[in-house]
Regions:
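Active-site entrance/lid segments in N-terminal catalytic domains of soluble metabolic enzymes
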Residues: 1-217, 245-250, 424
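Alpha/beta catalytic cores of nucleotide-metabolism and tRNA/nucleoside-modifying enzymes
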Residues: 1-21, 187-220, 225-427
Length: 427
């Protein structure tokens, strides 16, 4: 049976401004809730870990520690950070060993499985919530992923029929992520913009007719390619947006990074980096050029600068970078051409259901992969991306006469683009 309903992706729609806005400046718009943006990191090995999660936190992004991190480390971190667990890990930790959990604390857990349509998942979550109350701790549960508005309605009823809210957050969206091939190979998907809209309609219905907060918070997961997608997801009714590949393209991500010569490098000093002209460049002040040349001359034989030079020797402006490169190249300090030296750095990004993702978790490929590995250009510093995101979101809210996220989320009109603009998700 073919459903006679049009489904929209983010790029199929555009946000309509209010007739009149009472906002005088975008600076009046508050895009934060309790100090955080409405954004989670995807729990992906090539995005976030126990080593860099604070980079996200200090930029107002909520990190989720992925399943490739040792379980003992995740157990330690769950007292102050979201962590991801497999269903088996979740069942063991919060049911079999629930009596070992420290009382009087709150734990934020993402049960990270691909198929959020399994009833068994929610039955286990209900038991875990019951154990949490008996053992005097608070368990906040995120599950997913789902790709049917009816499943969201079922979860609202599920929460309503229990004496407590079992599922607090739900990730919606299957197959839209850059590292996911579920849709192309398994044919499971629901157009993301329409999915958010339909789930939000259910949420409004239950809030109106039950006067209870029984519906899970909506997390739009997958398919975020640009700032406008974040804005559209929120406008359609998502409480939060989850981002994977875009954050992998930040220099602070945990993905393996390669310079223009395909040489793997490490990043030691985030603050010294800057993005310029499509590549990753070093950050310098006016006097930094001469000083850095002297440092390079002193350390050129150690191999350190030879290894890290694609990130640490390029200047703030491309002209200065070329001048500096000429200096190094003419003195034969570097066995790279200028073109190679100024080449685009890349990051290795993979879905957690890919072969690389499975190996990162268990050390071996365990099943047919529904994810892929890609090498993406490094395009941002995290703080730079967040600065842009905050500015663009405030701008959208000012057009829509919204002073805060509560006014903005789910309360906007969107309209389909012209035919020539539709279906450009992979542009």
């Amino acid at each position: 049976m073919i459903l006679e309903k049009e489904g929209y992706a983010y790029d199929d729609l555009t946000l309509v401004p209010r007739v009149i806005s009472n906002i005088k400046s975008r600076s009046e718009c508050d895009v934060y809730t309790n100090g955080n943006l409405p954004i989670f990191t995807a729990p992906m090995a090539s995005v976030v870990s126990d080593k860099n999660y604070n980079e996200f936190k200090k930029n107002g992004i909520m990190p989720i520690i992925p399943r490739n991190i040792n379980i003992n480390i995740r157990k330690e971190m769950m007292e102050y950070s979201w962590i991801a667990l497999s269903l088996k890990e979740f069942e063991e930790l919060f049911i079999s060993k629930s009596h070992e959990i420290k009382p009087n604390k709150t734990y934020h857990i993402c049960v990270d499985i691909a198929n959020g349509h399994m009833k068994y998942l929610y039955d286990i979550c209900a038991i875990a919530k019951d154990y949490a109350m008996k053992n005097n701790y608070i368990l906040v549960i995120m599950t997913g992923n789902i790709a049917n508005p009816g499943t969201y309605e079922w979860l609202c009823k599920f929460n309503l029929n229990n004496s407590y809210k079992v599922i607090d957050y739900i990730r919606i969206g299957i197959g839209g992520g850059k590292g996911c091939i579920t849709t192309s190979n398994v044919s499971i998907h629901y157009p993301q913009a329409t999915l958010i809209d339909m789930c939000y309609r259910q949420k409004k219905y239950y809030l109106k007719y039950t006067n209870k907060d029984v519906c899970p918070k909506i997390i739009a997961d997958g398919g975020i390619r640009n700032y406008d997608h974040v804005i559209k997801a929120l406008a359609l009714g998502a409480d939060y947006v989850m981002i994977g590949s875009l954050f992998a393209q930040c220099i602070e991500s945990t993905g393996e990074k390669y310079d223009g010569t395909n040489t793997k490098f490490d990043v030691n000093d985030y603050k010294s980096l800057r993005i310029e002209n499509g590549g990753v460049f070093g950050y310098y002040n006016e006097d930094g050029m001469k000083k850095k040349i002297l440092e390079f001359e002193e350390k050129k034989n150690t191999g350190y600068y030879r290894k890290y030079v694609p990130l640490e020797t390029l200047a703030l402006r491309e002209e200065a970078a070329v001048e500096y490169m000429d200096n190094l190249y003419e003195n034969d300090y570097l066995n790279l051409s200028k073109e190679q030296y100024l080449g685009q750095c890349t990051v290795k990004f993979f879905g957690m259901a890919s072969k690389d993702g499975q190996i990162s978790i268990s050390g071996e490929k365990t099943k047919t992969a529904e994810g892929i590995t890609k090498y993406l250009p490094i395009e941002f510093t995290l703080s730079g991306w967040v600065e842009n995101m905050v500015s663009y979101l405030r701008s959208a809210m000012s057009y829509c006469d919204c002073f805060d996220l509560k006014e903005f989320i789910g309360n906007q009109d969107l309209i389909p683009n012209s035919i020539s603009e539709i279906n450009t998700v992979n542009k």
